[in-house]
């Protein structure tokens, strides 16, 4: 079946001649960096045209926020499958993994996941490259005498390699044994150092691990040290429940207030803010309303955005983001009229959205697209999504959703745009067919379900 990629509304397209599946190399790379499914469609039509870009994608993580959306390894793997000489791409990925050095990026996870896809297809060179890197990092951990006075990148790399390599119970037990031996032999190791691996794979192979722990002291040590960390975290959580406001400060306190605080508690923090005159301490008091909406007239907070104290300025802008009040909208519009077109000001407009602001909000988003300011565009998307949350009394700026789908650099946030487009019956067959190849697994599943 021939599939034409979904085309965004013409007024939001940078290239007015864009024709769906047929893209220039520049259009292709920009769409690929966002993880849009049209790139898979385009590669299948004209693989040689995009070969160098797909090869580039093999060598590095290019997800905007891999911690939230995952890497783009499946997405890259699917594009590579359009080429008959897969070994060329596997060798390039293996070479990048060999050259990789711990740096705190998500490159290692992208490279190792991509190689594992090919290893599962029977390419031994891909599996060998993974095993060699795992052995290299593990050997380095055993050679280390102390924990570094920085983020322990090597530990994170080892855990990520373990997650990728543990594809069945046998490989899981081998890696759990290696991690347990590290716990036994190295004093610098701390309980819960492999919490991600334990929670992800340990639950999957729990019974197998418990049985093996009775016979293998390394696996037993791994199980004990990870379980001890879970117990400690649960105890800490219970302590925080007893007197939450005594144990929480800043943004954490504000989140608790937004969901659980009674009116009397909120008023106490309002009073604490009002009575404070010293700018630095006033900023600290106002952090209680970073997430919890300020319940009274916000004019004092608006005035604090003009403070000479930068900390108080920033805290005031953050507090205004949660307030739906005519004076806040008027403040935002006045700022725009005076040339203040910042992401912080856009957030106030999004929270206080009314249909009359449709044109100016589109204009502000278009400015970010033209400047390729994707961080600000990403932030604007999150501000807009607040209007769609359950229980929100904000009118839905649904006309902005196609723009967010098209240009949001984060596939996790793009998923939100699609969810809200679905609620407003804005999804088309063309769009869903493109989503079948999206970099985001949840988007692909949603599209497949709706196209049945």
Would you name each region that the model predicts?
Residues 4-5, 10:
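Acidic, Ala/Val/Gly-enriched low-complexity intrinsically disordered segments
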Residues 6, 18-90:
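Charged, amphipathic alpha-helical stretches
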Residues 22-27, 430, 449-452:
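Terminal, non-catalytic domain-edge segments
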Residues 24-25, 50-61, 87-99, 124-143, ...:
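Amphipathic alpha-helical scaffolding segments comprising HEAT/armadillo-like alpha-solenoid repeats
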Residues 37-48, 67-85, 107-125, 143-170, ...:
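Structural detector for internal amphipathic alpha-helices that build alpha-solenoid repeat scaffolds
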Residues 80, 94-105:
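Post-signal peptide N-terminal segment of secreted/secretory-pathway proteins
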């Amino acid at each position: 079946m021939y599939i034409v990629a979904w085309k965004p509304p013409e007024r939001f397209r940078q290239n007015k001649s864009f024709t769906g599946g047929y893209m220039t190399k520049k259009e292709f790379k920009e769409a690929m960096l966002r993880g849009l499914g049209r790139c898979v469609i385009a590669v299948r039509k004209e693989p040689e045209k995009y070969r160098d870009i797909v090869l580039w994608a093999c060598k590095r993580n290019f997800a905007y926020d891999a911690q939230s959306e995952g890497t783009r390894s499946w997405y890259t793997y699917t594009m590579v499958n359009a080429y008959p000489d897969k070994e060329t791409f596997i060798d390039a990925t293996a070479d990048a993994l060999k050259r990789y050095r711990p740096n705190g990026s998500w490159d290692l996870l992208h490279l190792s996941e991509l190689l594992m896809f090919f290893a599962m297809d029977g390419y031994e060179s891909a599996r060998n490259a993974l095993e060699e890197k795992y052995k290299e990092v593990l050997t380095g951990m055993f050679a280390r005498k102390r924990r570094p006075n920085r983020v322990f990148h090597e530990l994170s790399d080892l855990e990520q390699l373990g997650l990728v390599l543990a594809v069945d119970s046998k490989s899981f037990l081998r890696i759990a044994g290696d991690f347990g031996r590290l716990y036994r032999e190295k004093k610098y190791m701390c309980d819960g150092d492999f919490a991600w691996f334990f929670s992800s794979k340990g639950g999957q192979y729990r019974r197998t691990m418990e049985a093996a722990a009775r016979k293998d002291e390394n696996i037993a040590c791994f199980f004990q040290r990870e379980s001890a960390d879970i117990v400690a975290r649960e105890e800490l959580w219970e302590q925080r429940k007893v007197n939450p406001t005594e144990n929480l400060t800043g943004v954490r306190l504000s989140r608790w207030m937004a969901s659980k605080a009674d009116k009397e508690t909120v008023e106490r923090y309002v009073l604490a803010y009002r009575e404070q005159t010293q700018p630095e301490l006033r900023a600290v008091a106002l952090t209680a309303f970073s997430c919890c909406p300020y319940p009274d007239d916000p004019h004092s907070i608006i005035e604090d955005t003009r403070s000479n104290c930068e900390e108080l300025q920033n805290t005031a802008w953050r507090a205004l983001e949660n307030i739906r009040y005519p004076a806040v909208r008027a403040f935002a519009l006045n700022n725009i009229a005076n040339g203040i077109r910042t992401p912080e000001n856009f957030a106030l407009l999004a929270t206080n959205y009314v249909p009359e602001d449709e044109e100016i909000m589109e204009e502000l988003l278009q400015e970010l697209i033209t400047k390729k300011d994707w961080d600000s565009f990403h932030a604007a998307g999150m501000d807009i999504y607040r209007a769609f949350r359950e229980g929100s009394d904000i009118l839905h700026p649904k006309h902005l959703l196609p723009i967010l789908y098209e240009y949001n650099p984060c596939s996790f946030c793009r998923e939100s745009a699609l969810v809200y487009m679905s609620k407003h019956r804005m999804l088309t067959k063309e769009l869903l067919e493109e989503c079948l190849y999206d970099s985001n697994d949840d988007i692909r599943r949603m599209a497949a379900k709706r196209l049945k």
